[in-house]
Design a protein with these regions (language model features):
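Core catalytic alpha/beta fold that binds nucleotide/phospho-ligands
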Residues: 1-108
């Protein structure tokens, strides 16, 4: 379900409170679900959960890194991610903005 980078980051939370660890996993799952829904496919063969990694910019803003077949099958689009979590909820919103470079077939 989680990418190697996410599992490594989670392992660093070993001494963190149980709520912090649960919040980390819930937020990462929420991003995967939100991305798959933005694609309109759900979590299926075109969108593989452990090929979607949530990372953070230096200023803390989250972004998505795609890999493997999920990247290969991804539309040409800018991915916008908003992520919030407060016990007991984790909410992610993903918007795919069409890449109008002219190289796309127009599908998202």
């Amino acid at each position: 379900m989680f990418s190697p980078c996410e599992l490594e980051e989670y392992s660093k939370l070993e001494k963190a409170h149980e709520d912090v660890r649960a919040q980390f996993l819930a937020s990462r799952f929420a991003v995967k679900e939100a991305y798959s829904k933005a694609r309109g496919t759900g979590l299926n063969g075109l969108v593989i959960p452990n090929e979607i990694t949530t990372a953070k910019e230096k200023d803390g803003r989250p972004y998505i890194i795609l890999s493997g077949s999920t990247l290969d099958n991804a539309p040409r689009a800018v991915i916008h991610l908003s992520l919030t979590h407060e016990q007991p909820l984790a909410i992610a919103m993903v918007v795919l903005e069409s890449d109008d470079s002219g190289d796309s077939d127009g599908s998202l």
